[in-house]
């Protein structure tokens, strides 16, 4: 039974993250190729905007009204249909893609995909706890397979080509891939073990309790408030490389020295090293949490972001490719030691009644407010130092990319130093705040 439960959750994580991996790191190149390079940040910011309210809202629904595993499937179904519609529009529009219709369908898709990140974590935690597992020890190895799914989807769209020889990573076909995977998740979720709504309604409940807003009471605890604020500040960094790493590496195609390099031609495959590193990073989390505690683990993540951005600025697909590779390797620690450890920390500090809502709140601060500010600010920086060049090979963003990445590295360094000074680690990690 124990092996069966783990296997079910492994499959869930593979599908969950493959749906995102199909386009997350390559969408920027497609947008640039159809003349929407100056609006890449808006597309990625939309993921943050919907994360401001949708994860919290869906967390409340899962706590109060619809079992979490069924709600997870419903969200994937809506997301998959909308993403498939976006792909169909891209196919019919060709090179005459208009911003409004593509963005509208994409926005609807991510509005229902983003809450599934927190929901899938909640479903896994609940099923593991119901079967007597220690989530801190058992969940990270399961979550590793989510990254495996993400990598497989990335590599699929990198190497798969359409009839005209265009890689999926540079076309609307990445959206088709994501849509089909999400629809598969819809079916799979309805076969998962039940995760009943845990919150009870009663006449004595306050309005905040009835609508699941009690998770915001976590801000009454000074340390948790600081934790959530810095989650937002570090969340600024999360989507920057997702949105701009592929256009950055691909732009070397129009730089004579690097035009024929393997990295410039296969940006998504090069970036996939980041996800391989993420897989290994997840396995280190239980050990790191035990040895260092949440503060040091998050500090490691913050300084890893400094290296991630700084090495991007110094590297290239030629003699400097080793710096790009190290940057990809560092990403595993930068992402996992913040996202996964932070989610586990929230789970340990909250009771079952509001855990879904608390995970939604964490998602709001990181992938919501933080990522929105980050992607819009990053787009402004990119627009300041780069410009679009139309070539026979397509549209590319060229300019002073080095300065762009050094600015991002400087920001991450400031956040790390402030967190080191202000955050105090709790003496009892398992003491419930709410």
What is the predicted function of each stretch?
Residues 1-52, 223-259, 266-267, 339:
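Helix-loop boundary and gating motifs at the non-cytosolic
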Residues 14, 76-83, 95-119, 123, ...:
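Hydrophobic core of transmembrane alpha-helices in multi-pass small-molecule transporters
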Residues 77-96, 303-317:
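C-terminal ends and interior cores of transmembrane alpha-helices
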Residues 57, 85-91, 181-194, 368, ...:
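Multi-pass alpha-helical transporter architecture, strongest
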Residues 159-180, 380-412:
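A membrane-interface helix-boundary motif in multi-pass transporters
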Residues 1-3, 193-229, 254-259:
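Juxtamembrane intracellular "pre-TM" segments in multi-pass secondary transporters
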Residues 42-63, 269-284:
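Central cavity-lining transmembrane alpha-helices of secondary-active solute carriers
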Residues 296-342:
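C-terminal transmembrane helical hairpin of 12-TM major facilitator-type secondary transporters
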């Amino acid at each position: 039974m124990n092996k069966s439960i783990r296997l079910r959750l492994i499959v869930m994580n593979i599908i969950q993250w493959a749906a995102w991996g199909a386009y997350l790191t390559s969408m920027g190149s497609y947008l640039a190729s159809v003349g929407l390079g100056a609006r890449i940040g808006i597309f990625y910011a939309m993921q943050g905007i919907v994360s401001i309210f949708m994860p919290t809202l869906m967390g409340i629904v899962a706590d109060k009204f619809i079992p979490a595993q069924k709600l997870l499937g419903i969200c994937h179904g809506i997301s998959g249909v909308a993403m498939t519609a976006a792909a169909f529009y891209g196919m019919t529009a060709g090179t005459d893609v208009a911003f409004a219709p593509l963005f509208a369908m994409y926005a609807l898709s991510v509005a229902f995909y983003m809450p599934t990140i927190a929901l899938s974590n909640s479903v896994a935690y609940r099923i593991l706890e119901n079967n007597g597992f220690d989530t801190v020890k058992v969940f990270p190895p399961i979550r590793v397979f989510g990254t495996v799914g993400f990598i497989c989807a990335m590599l699929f769209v990198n190497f798969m080509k359409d009839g005209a020889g265009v890689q999926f990573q540079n076309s609307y076909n990445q959206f088709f891939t994501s849509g089909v995977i999400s629809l598969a998740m819809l079916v799979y979720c309805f076969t998962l073990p039940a995760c009943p709504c845990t919150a009870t309604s009663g006449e004595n409940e306050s309005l905040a309790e009835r609508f699941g807003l009690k998770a915001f009471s976590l801000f009454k605890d000074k340390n948790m408030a600081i934790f959530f604020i810095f989650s937002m500040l570090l969340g600024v960094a999360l989507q920057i490389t997702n949105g701009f790493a592929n256009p950055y590496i691909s732009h070397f195609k129009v730089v004579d020295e690097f035009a024929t390099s393997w990295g410039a031609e296969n940006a998504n495959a090069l970036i996939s090293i980041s996800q391989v590193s993420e897989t290994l990073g997840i396995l280190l989390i239980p050990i790191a949490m035990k040895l260092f505690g949440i503060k040091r683990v998050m500090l490691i993540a913050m300084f890893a972001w400094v290296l991630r951005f700084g090495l991007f600025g110094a590297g290239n697909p030629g003699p400097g490719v080793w710096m790009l590779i190290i940057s990809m390797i560092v990403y595993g620690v930068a992402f996992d030691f913040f996202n996964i450890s932070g989610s586990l920390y929230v789970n340990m500090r909250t009771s079952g009644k509001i855990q879904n809502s608390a995970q939604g709140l964490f998602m709001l601060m990181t992938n919501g407010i933080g990522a929105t500010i980050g992607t819009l600010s990053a787009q402004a920086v990119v627009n300041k130092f780069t410009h679009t060049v139309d070539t026979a090979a397509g549209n590319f963003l060229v300019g002073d990319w080095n300065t762009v990445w050094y600015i991002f590295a400087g920001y991450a360094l400031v956040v790390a130093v402030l967190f080191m000074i202000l955050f105090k680690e709790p003496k009892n990690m398992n003491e419930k705040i709410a």
